[in-house]
Amino acid sequence: NKVYHNNNLVWQKQFFIYNNGVIGNNGNIWVHWSAYPNNYEFNKNENGKLIARGGYGDTQLKIISGGYNVSGYSMLHVVGNYELNIANYGEDWFGLSSVANDYNPNICNQYMKIGDTAKSFHLQIPFSFNGTAYFNWRFLTFHKMYISQIYVV
């Protein structure tokens, strides 16, 4: 899954679990986001919805990674880095904070502020967890965004 050249990593397999509105063939991710006063959800059957939120306040994007069998238990087992790419439209800046460590203390808080020239960014999370990983992203003061891809490397 990795290729080295002169001891330098030059390529490694990327395991997409969400890519431009298409869930990876494993189909084991469920994404939920909510914006006051309404709550919205999209899963593998409702991909690529805009995350629209105007004005001030929090919008939360919750990513639950892991397959669920008929009994409702997670089948996730991933060790590696977890990356989230998000596109931003029409807003000068927005904040993104991860409070994933509320659910898994091995994952640290991360926060990022994007200037008005930035159209997208990715956030890489050190990730080593066996079970259900519940990420709670808080988006602050943005207008329109959408998830472009989520993948494990």
Segments predicted by a language model, with ranges:
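Short carbohydrate-recognition loop motifs
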Residues: 40-58
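Extracellular carbohydrate recognition and processing domains
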Residues: 101-130
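Extracellular carbohydrate-recognition regions
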Residues: 2, 8-39
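Secreted extracellular polysaccharide-interacting domains
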Residues: 54-71, 91-93, 103-107
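Beta-strand acidic-aromatic groove motif in beta-rich domains, primarily in extracellular
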Residues: 85-99
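Extra-cytoplasmic beta-strand recognition segments
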Residues: 19-22, 50, 64-88, 125
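Extracellular beta-strand elements of beta-rich domains used
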Residues: 145-152
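Short beta-strand-plus-loop segments that form exposed binding edges in beta-rich domains
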Residues: 136-143
